[in-house]
């Protein structure tokens, strides 16, 4: 199961959904804009 918008995540084990990226500072899944 992947993590969606603003779900807590681990930047070293990024389980965010397609199109999202774990934000290292906030430890949340956010839209990947790049």
Swiss-Prot record:
GO annotation, cellular component aspect: extracellular region
InterPro entries: Huwentoxin-1, Huwentoxin_CS1
Other noteworthy facts: Shows only a very weak inhibition on human Nav1.5/SCN5A.
GO molecular function: ion channel inhibitor activity; potassium channel regulator activity; sodium channel regulator activity; toxin activity
Subcellular location: Secreted
SUPFAM superfamilies in the record: omega toxin-like (SSF57059)
Family classification: Belongs to the neurotoxin 10 (Hwtx-1) family. 61 (VSTX3) subfamily.
Domain notes: The presence of a 'disulfide through disulfide knot' structurally defines this protein as a knottin.
Main location: secreted
Organ and tissue specificity: Expressed by the venom gland.
Disulfide bonds: 2-17, 9-22, 16-29
Tagged with keyword Disulfide bond: yes
Pfam families: Toxin_12
Top-level lineage group: Eukaryota
Protein name: Voltage sensor toxin 3
Keyword ATP-binding annotated: no
Keyword annotations: Disulfide bond, Ion channel impairing toxin, Knottin, Neurotoxin, Potassium channel impairing toxin, Secreted, Toxin, Voltage-gated sodium channel impairing toxin
Signal peptide (from-to): none
Protein function: Potent voltage-gated sodium channel blocker (IC(50)=190 nM and 210 nM on human and rat Nav1.3/SCN3A respectively, 430 nM on human Nav1.7/SCN9A, 770 nM and 290 nM on human and rat Nav1.8/SCN10A respectively). Binds the voltage-sensor domain of the potassium channel KvAP (from Aeropyrum pernix) and weakly inhibits this channel.
């Amino acid at each position: 199961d992947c993590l969606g918008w603003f779900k807590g995540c681990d930047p070293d084990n990024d389980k965010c959904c397609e199109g999202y990226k774990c934000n290292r500072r906030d430890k949340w899944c956010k839209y990947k804009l790049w």
